[in-house]
């Protein structure tokens, strides 16, 4: 494959909350936009405005007042293919401004993605977008590659779902993967709830975006939750103020760390699940005893919901408490982990050794969609 812009591979990481897309070899995605498709609630109110039948991403977000918004990816898994096709179309033609039939395309998938889903992705890429070649890679595996490793356990937490994925020599170990349906969106909802208890009202989708911003700017993970609660109760040292778009200033105190504490104590939002430190430990314990040492020493954090200050230290403390006392435990929290899945895809798709791994149009025509199970694992 020649190295000119014409045949550069595309990398598209489809998350529940955000689509990250760009060109292989780049160090960051060119396009990052919300994974939403909006359709007008009422037909043609604006005469002659050339109203479209659907809007994608930021445009859907800004026009949400007149639209019904749908997320085609729920908990990391694509559930609405018509809308997903619109998102891919928007990614290629409006965001990256490329003709997909000229570029090999690397897509990402959630761990334990159903077989039928991988086939459907493959089929749409070849039949609707006519890509010359494609590949489907597991998100957590790409994050591990981005950190320069091929063995380790990834905690990948985004907007819709959290996974613990142990990986040995580049292969995810499916029997030990843990999935937790608690992620960024749930934390935003919980912050809305506890701010409402404080007397601030956040209810609409527009207000939810404000709360998400508060969460991203002010929340952090406490090393010792009880201690932090005591500190917050006895002094105002942990309080921060935030200016709302209308100029009103609100003060936020223990909510700053009560919100992400939910990751360690899902009972805060009424879930019976174990926290992320326990799911990590459980995942390691489901692996062969001989590789556990390598997993403990290579705990890689990935995804937007692992961006809270203090989360790595807290994980270190919690896992040390669960693991055998002599075990060396290391948490790796790369600064760019918000995009590490995409970055791993960019690295993989530009490796010379990877070029034989692509599923070509010819192979697809000969074998059909099931080729994906033979070539991508």
From Swiss-Prot:
Oxidation of Met-46 and Met-49 by MICALs (MICAL1, MICAL2 or MICAL3) to form methionine sulfoxide promotes actin filament depolymerization. MICAL1 and MICAL2 produce the (R)-S-oxide form. The (R)-S-oxide form is reverted by MSRB1 and MSRB2, which promotes actin repolymerization. Monomethylation at Lys-86 (K86me1) regulates actin-myosin interaction and actomyosin-dependent processes. Demethylation by ALKBH4 is required for maintaining actomyosin dynamics supporting normal cleavage furrow ingression during cytokinesis and cell migration. It comes from the Eukaryota. It holds the Pfam family Actin. It is an enzyme of class 3 (hydrolase). The modification N6-methyllysine is found at residue 86. The modification Tele-methylhistidine is found at residue 75. SMART domains: ACTIN. It is found in: Cytoplasm, Cytoskeleton. The modification Methionine (R)-sulfoxide is found at residues 46, 49. Shows overlapping but distinct expression patterns with other actins. In tailbud embryos, expressed in embryonic muscle (myotomes). In adults, expressed only in heart muscle. CDD domains: ASKHA_NBD_actin (cd10224). GO terms for cellular component: actin cytoskeleton; actin filament; cell body; cytoplasm; filopodium; lamellipodium; sarcomere. Belongs to the actin family. This is Actin, alpha cardiac muscle 1. It comes from Xenopus laevis. The gene is actc1.
């Amino acid at each position: 494959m020649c190295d000119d812009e014409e045949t550069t591979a595309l990398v598209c990481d489809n998350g529940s909350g955000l689509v990250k897309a760009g060109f292989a070899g780049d160090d960051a995605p060119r396009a990052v936009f919300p994974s939403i498709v909006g359709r007008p609630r009422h037909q043609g109110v604006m005469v002659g405005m050339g109203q479209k039948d659907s809007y994608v991403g930021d445009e859907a977000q800004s026009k949400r007042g007149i639209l019904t918004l749908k997320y085609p990816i729920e908990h990391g898994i694509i559930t609405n293919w018509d809308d997903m096709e619109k998102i891919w179309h928007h990614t290629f033609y409006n965001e990256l401004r490329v003709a997909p039939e000229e570029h090999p395309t690397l897509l990402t998938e959630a761990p334990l993605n159903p077989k039928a889903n991988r086939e459907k992705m493959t089929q749409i890429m070849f039949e609707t977008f006519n890509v010359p070649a494609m590949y489907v890679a597991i998100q957590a595996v790409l994050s591990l590659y981005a950190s320069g490793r091929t063995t380790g356990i990834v905690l990948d937490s985004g907007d819709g779902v959290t996974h613990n994925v142990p990986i040995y020599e580049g292969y995810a170990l499916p029997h030990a993967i843990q999935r937790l349906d608690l992620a960024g969106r749930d934390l935003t909802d919980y912050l809305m709830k506890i701010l409402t208890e404080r007397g601030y009202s956040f209810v609409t989708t527009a207000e939810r975006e404000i709360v998400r911003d508060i969460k991203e700017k002010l929340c952090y993970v406490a090393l010792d939750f009880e201690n932090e609660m005591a500190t917050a109760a006895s002094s105002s040292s942990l309080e921060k103020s935030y200016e709302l778009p209308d100029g009103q200033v609100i003060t936020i105190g223990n909510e700053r760390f009560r919100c992400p504490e939910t990751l360690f104590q899902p009972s805060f939002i009424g879930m019976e699940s174990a926290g992320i430190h326990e799911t990590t430990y459980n995942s390691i314990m489901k692996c062969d005893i001989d590789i556990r040492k390598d997993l403990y020493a290579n705990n890689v954090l990935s995804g937007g919901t692992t961006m809270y200050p203090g989360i790595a230290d807290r994980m270190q403390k919690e896992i040390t408490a669960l693991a055998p006392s002599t075990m060396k435990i290391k948490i790796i929290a790369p600064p760019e982990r918000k995009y590490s899945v995409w970055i791993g895809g960019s690295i993989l798709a530009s490796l010379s050794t990877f070029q034989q791994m692509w599923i070509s149009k010819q192979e697809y025509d000969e074998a059909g969609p099931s080729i994906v199970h033979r070539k991508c694992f």
